[in-house]
Amino acid sequence: MFYPDLFSTCKQFGNNFINTKIPITMNAVTIDFNSVIKITDEQFYQLCQDNPNVKFERNAKGEIIVMPPTGGETGNRNFEISVDFGIWNRQTKLGVCFDSSTCFKLPNGADRSPDVSWIKQERWDTLTPEQKEKFPPIAPDFVLELMSPTDTLKETQSKLQEYIDNGVRLSWLINRKTRRVEIYRQGQEVEVLQSPIELSGEDVLPGFVLNLQTIWD
C-alpha cells in the first residue's frame, strides 16, 4: 500500500518527492520512478539523508532499491569481518576501509553499498573533499558481500559481477547458508570454494587473511 502512495506523491510533487519519509521494509523492493521523474545524483543523496533509517541503493537503470534491515546473526558477522579488516588496515596503512553504510557511485551510474569495501590510499586521495563527504564516485579496489536470509543468490551474484565490470579488482561473496564462497577477479572466471577455512587478500590486500571460522559457526 505504501509504494503506490509514494508513486502518487512523486507524480504530484515532482522534485519534492525526496521529502517523503520511507518506512522500513523486511524485503528488498525496487521502485522505478523513471516514467515520472529522472532522479538526479543530488536528489538521490538528499533522499538518503532525509531517511537515515532506511538503506537505499540505485541500479544502473536508475531504479531505487529499498534494502531490508540486517538481522542479528548477519549483523554480528558483518561486524566481526569489519573488525578484521580494520585491524589489518590500521597496521598496514595501505588504504581506507568502509562499512555497509557507505554508498559508492559506480562508473555505470549505479549507487551501491557493499557490506565491506576498501580503497587504496593513492586512489582515495584523488577525490575532492566534497566527493569523499557524499557518495564517492569511485569503484573500490575490494568489496565483500555477506548474504543475508533476505538476499537472493542470483541478484547478489549479479551485483558482484557489476562490481568487477566497474573496476573492482577483487570481490568475495560469502554465503553462510551453503558455506560457499565465490571469488570474483578481473579477467578471470569466478572461483567457487566450499567451506574454506580462510581467504587470502592476494595482491589487492597484501598480507590480509580472513578467518572464516567465526562466519561458519
Residue ranges with predicted function:
Residues 2-217:
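Gly/Pro/Ser/Thr-rich low-complexity, intrinsically disordered segments predominantly at protein N-termini
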